[in-house]
Amino acid sequence: MIKEAIKIQGTKEGLVIVLEEDVDIETLKEKIVNRIEKSLKFFEGATLTVRVKSLSVKEEKLQELKDVIFEKYGIEVRIKNFQEKHIKNVTDDEIFNGLEEGITKFHKGTVRSGQVVKYHGNLVIIGDVNPGGLVQAAGNIVVMGTLRGIAHAGFTGNKEAVIVASSLRAMQLRIANVISRAPDKDDASDYPEIAVVKKGKIIVKPLYHLNDLW
């Protein structure tokens, strides 16, 4: 039995599939194909990097895996670190370490009360986030509408993540493990604002003050 044989992570280099130690490549091939079949839109246009944590996996088998994925789905696959003795894991520090980095998901429509939209990358909401709605991203969050619910950016621990909204009236803001209370009613603004972590606290500034934050 393979325990967590496949881990899919979003990083600066795109989607990364991590293959665990002592794996059966045929079983992995089947599992990867099944994962892609279940989430075709998620993988559409993506670049896949396969990181191998075991040198027991033969290179020709990995090439076969690349060929199968490319022939079936047109997805380019890169094999990384195959010849290295010590394979470096993808860590949270590698994931979305800046405002301009990382893969992005676009969610079209209103996020309603009780609804959760979560993504291991940057997340753009084209619509509003209603009270009781929750949006979570490993990277940055941009709401092209009114943010009235809860937004949690950098949920993997990235304090460099930001939250941006056309109108920021959130019930709660979270960046990594830092939490901010809802703004007072009189403080709510109708112009775009950005929330960042500074000195261990979340601060909110007008978006046109962006250059003052760095």
From Swiss-Prot:
Pfam families: MinC_C, MinC_N
Gene3D superfamilies: 2.160.20.70, 3.30.160.540
Transmembrane segments: none
Domain of life: Bacteria
Keyword annotations: Cell cycle, Cell division, Septation
Any one GO BP annotation for this protein: regulation of cell septum assembly
Subunit structure: Interacts with MinD and FtsZ.
PANTHER family named in the record: SEPTUM SITE-DETERMINING PROTEIN MINC
Job of this protein: Cell division inhibitor that blocks the formation of polar Z ring septums. Rapidly oscillates between the poles of the cell to destabilize FtsZ filaments that have formed before they mature into polar Z rings. Prevents FtsZ polymerization.
Family the entry assigns: Belongs to the MinC family.
Protein name per the record: Probable septum site-determining protein MinC
Phylogenetic lineage: Bacteria, Bacillati, Bacillota, Clostridia, Thermoanaerobacterales
Gene coding for it: minC
